[in-house]
C-alpha cells in the first residue's frame, strides 16, 4: 500500500477528532475558525 495515503487518512481522522473536541468549545472555535467553519 501507499504510505502517503495512510498518512493523509490519519491526518484527516485527527482533524475530525480535533473538530469534534474543539468546535463545541467557543474559545477553541474562536481560535480555529478554519477548522470549525469548513462547511461554509
Curated annotation (Swiss-Prot):
Any one annotated GO CC term: host cell postsynaptic membrane
Keyword flag Secreted: yes
Family under the similarity heading: Belongs to the conotoxin A superfamily.
Record-level Gene Ontology MF annotations: acetylcholine receptor inhibitor activity; ion channel regulator activity; toxin activity
Pfam family membership, one: Toxin_8
Annotated S-S bridges: 22-28, 23-36
Protein function: Alpha-conotoxins act on postsynaptic membranes, they bind to the nicotinic acetylcholine receptors (nAChR) and thus inhibit them. Has possibly a distinct nAChR binding mode from other alpha-conotoxins, due to a different three residue motif (lacks the Ser-Xaa-Pro motif).
Tissue spec: Expressed by the venom duct.
Region (Lacks the Ser-Xaa-Pro motif that is crucial for potent interaction with nAChR): 24-26
Subcellular location: Secreted
Protein name: Alpha-conotoxin-like Qc1.1c
Residue ranges annotated as propeptide in the record: 1-19
Main localization, broad class: secreted
Keywords for the protein's UniProt record, in alphabetical order: Acetylcholine receptor inhibiting toxin, Disulfide bond, Ion channel impairing toxin, Neurotoxin, Postsynaptic neurotoxin, Secreted, Toxin
Amino acid at each position: 500500500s501507499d504510505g502517503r495515503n495512510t498518512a493523509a487518512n490519519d491526518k484527516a481522522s485527527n482533524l475530525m477528532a480535533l473538530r469534534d473536541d474543539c468546535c463545541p468549545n467557543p474559545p477553541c472555535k474562536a481560535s480555529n475558525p478554519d477548522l470549525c467553519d469548513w462547511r461554509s
